[in-house]
Every structure is written in structure tokens, then in C-alpha cells.
Amino acid sequence: PHTTTRRQRQMCIRDRNSVAEALGMSLPGCAVIPAPYREREQISFETGSRIVKMVHEDLTPSKIMTKKAFENAVIVASAIGASSNCTTHLIAIAKHMGVKFDLSNWQKLGHKIPLLANCQPAGEHLMEGFYRAGGIPAIMKELMKNKKIHQNLITVTGKTVAQNLRKKIDVDRDVIKTFKDNLTDKAGFLVMKGNFFSSAIMKTSVISKEFRDRYLSNPKHPNVFKGKAVVFEGPEDYHDRINSKKLKIDENSILIIRGCGPVGYPGSAEVVNICLLYTSDAADEWWG
């Protein structure tokens, strides 16, 4: 479980950095350089130097983070199978920039974007492999080739997206796929509404074929998951009761943790890896 947690957090960090690069707010290739690499130290120096020049050029964040820049970020996030946390971060940044942007943009822009990054948890490789394979520039170049991102937006380099991507990139196609040879045709987020919540986001890139075949293939109700809802009043309640025999949780259960949003918690609760607390020993004891 600890290894799984570290890997998932590593991918979350990759996603946040990648969104910044896709927005045009970090130097090309900066997002996924592993921390111990010499290249990380070099690009850190280049970043500091570039910030000083941007001040003299009056190149401010508001000139870079436009509506179209946020659209690019959503498309790149979808192509790499980014964390669902990216939705709240990007919407919050857009609000501070005075850009109208909400959850509906994620589905409208990103749902039909294919998964290009063969990285965990949706794929096989870790962040270091993604960096060696070409990183975000390789992803953006593939998206630009297929006319999925805006090319003429200004970035922190003072150049456009297209100008930043002119350099030839050696791409490892086992890690970074092409549009035709993708991991899945639709990798973006779905926005859901219903009697459980006013709005929610689902990351579709991690829905495996096995899960679809087992739970979402009823011909009468395609793509519908049916199960018993088990409701918890916040993360603390979840931690206290998740392994209670009285709940009779099985693979058909839907776990709901209430009050985890920015108002209820406040500031949004961290509920990543909640299923790790549901132990296999408990399941064996309950169900034999």
C-alpha cells in the first residue's frame, strides 16, 4: 500500500506540473524532470533567469493564462490521464485570473481526447520513464499535429506554443503513444449529476476493460453500475467504520464520503487511497 501511495502521489505531482507547462506557465520540458537529475537544477536556474526577463518585458500571467490556454491545459491533462484533482486546481486558478471556466469545460474539451501516456495508474510506466520518453513536449506535439490544441498562444518563453515545439523530439512510443495507436480512444473526464450530488467528476482513463466487462456491460443498462450505497459522514467516520462487519461491503458497494468539499471540510479533504483501508483480511472474514 505504501508503494502504491507513493506512486500515485508521484503521478499527482506530475499532473500539476504538466498542467502548468500546458498553460504556458513553465519552461518547455520542465514539468516531469525527476528531482535528482542535473537537468532539474539547470532548468531551475533558467526559470529564475527567465522570470527576471519577463518582468522587464512586462509579460504577466494574465497575458499567458487566457481562456484558450486553459483549454490547452484540459486537453493535455486528458491526454496524460491526469488526476481528477486537476479539475479543482485549474478552475480555482481560472477564477483568480478572471476567466470563466467550470467543470463542464472538462467534459466538452477533454472527454474525446485519447490517452497518449502509458503511465500509471492507467498504464505501465512511472514519471522517470515518461520524462525519458519525451515528456509533455512530446504529448503537446502529438496533440498539435492532430490540431487539438491552440498553437499561437504566448508562453513564459515569450514565444508561442508552436515555436516552443519546433525542436525535434526523440519519442519512445512504448511510453507516449500516437493518436492512432493510443491506449484508449476517450480518456477525459465525465461530469455527473444526480440525487447524490449536484456535480461530480469521473476519470474515465482508469476504467479497465475487465471492470467494463464485469460491471458496465448489461445490454439493458449499458455503462450503468448498480450497487448498494454505503454513506460516511466525512473522512474520520470512514476511517472509523470502513472495516465494520455490519456494513457488509463487497465489490458491488458504492462508498460515499460526505462533507469533503471546500465548504464542508473546509478546503477539501484528502481522501486519496481510501480503499487501502478496506483490508483484504476483513473481506475474507466477512465473505469467506
Give residue spans per PLM region.
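Single conserved hydrophobic/aromatic residue that forms the stacking wall/gate
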Residues: 1-9, 13, 278-288
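Catalytic or ion-coupling anion/metal-binding cores of large enzyme and transporter domains
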Residues: 7-10, 14-277
